[in-house]
Amino acid sequence: MISPSNNCLRRLGGAGLLLLLLGACGILDTTREARPAFYSLYGARPGAISSIAAPRSISAPTLIVNPPHAAPGFDSHRIIYVREPHQLEYFARSEWIDTPARMIAPSIVAALENTSAFRAVVMTPSVAAGDLRLDVEILRLQHEFGSAPSHVRFTLRAYLVDNETRQVLAWQEFDETVAAEQDAPYGGVVAANRAVQNVMERLASFCAKAAGIWAPADSKRHKAGELPLSGQSMANPN
């Protein structure tokens, strides 16, 4: 015969086992935890600046684009926001799908190709040889909450270099601020994409104009009289 005390112990043991199983299910069920949201960054708007560029020609320079890099603090997947000057913070559950520098690289190439100012635009690493080289750096990409509405600020510095002479032909710093439609990570992401698109258009226009005044080193030496032009002799005609 089973005593009432034994029945009570069995019931308590069964209840304890059930609680343990429920606890284990809770640990394994990760759907209850807030998962991070991942966002992308696209900068090229095809057709936006093609009207400003000269038709593509075989004599146009080939442009080599080095992979963009970013200033410290802006070289990760984290989406940065600022509430106080000089203090960078990041959203806990919102991230870029890749680093901003890697995400904007295809957009830079697309925007430059759209100008038709270059014979070809090539992203390194590549075995292709180029006449000009473009180096870019992201100085900041941050969601700023210091005023209402909040806004995203994107700053990019670019150098256009003559590959043969290693001379900097032109450089410029591009700074864009776009208001966010909402004070939330997604609002900042939308504003960031618009800011990057604006900078890509300005960057492409800058490079196209600089390429328009570029001349190969040999051509410059011909004009300066350092080398004879075709059909001329270096000997004294007298």
Language model features with spans:
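C-terminal motif of bacterial Sec signal peptides marking the signal peptidase cleavage site
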Residues: 21-24
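Surface-exposed short loop/turn segments
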Residues: 26-47, 115-165, 181, 229-237
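Short secondary-structure boundary motifs at beta->alpha junctions and helix caps
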Residues: 88-95, 164-205
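Bacterial N-terminal signal peptides that target proteins for export
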Residues: 2-16
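A structural "domain/chain start" motif
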Residues: 26-100, 210-238
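Extracytoplasmic/secreted envelope proteins and their assembly/folding machinery
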Residues: 62, 101, 105-109, 115, ...
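Envelope-exposed proteins and targeting segments
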Residues: 59-61, 75-77, 84, 92, ...
